[in-house]
């Protein structure tokens, strides 16, 4: 890993960091010199693999298993971060669920499941980390949104609504936390090359559909934007939804 050290001395919590975009974000922030709390809901093996990758490159990392919808588990995660590393400077709310269901067939429990993770999870994480973020003097919160919040998407009313709410949450927090020196931004991925279940392969025409670049993004593309927003070059950037989707927002 190339380490330019712009995040040296900082501590980052990344939720949903065991795979895909979350994993890429954890690795990118570690490349910048940050110590990483790698959160996963239940898959310890995946989280430990990310920690090993960080440590093998000379970084520092900690596994913290816990469901972001569980306020007590999130409090324990924040406490573990401070106990191990002494501080929290960066929080990346990446944990999310991928679900599809026609709205007319959707149960309230299915609706609630998405809200619990995406919105309540972000709420719990910011609340738990806020005292440490304030002490940082230059704290950063990054929420990972989704292009569907702007375009809508069939059979994903719950996901679309939650991601749209996350953008509103970002803008509200940017106001609320500015006096504490905390920036709050949302990164909005589009078509990103992450593995799908074998029984639900991605249709070929979806691979670049809507992008104006004609290519599909990688988790590392999202991670690079997150890393920038966590660094000194983004000190004057807050309350923004940064689209990382090959211009799909323009072509939608």
Question: Positions of the model-derived regions?
Answer:
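Active-site helix of classical SDR
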Residues: 126, 162, 170
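Conserved glycine-rich cofactor-binding loop
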Residues: 11, 18-20
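Substrate-binding pocket helix/loop in short-chain dehydrogenase/reductase
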Residues: 102-103, 110-115, 197, 207
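Short C-terminal tail/terminal secondary-structure segment
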Residues: 2-3, 151, 205, 227, ...
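Short, small/polar-rich loop/turn modules that mediate ligand/substrate recognition or access, typified
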Residues: 138, 178, 183, 237-239
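Alpha-helical segment proximal to the catalytic Tyr-Lys
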Residues: 131, 175-176, 235
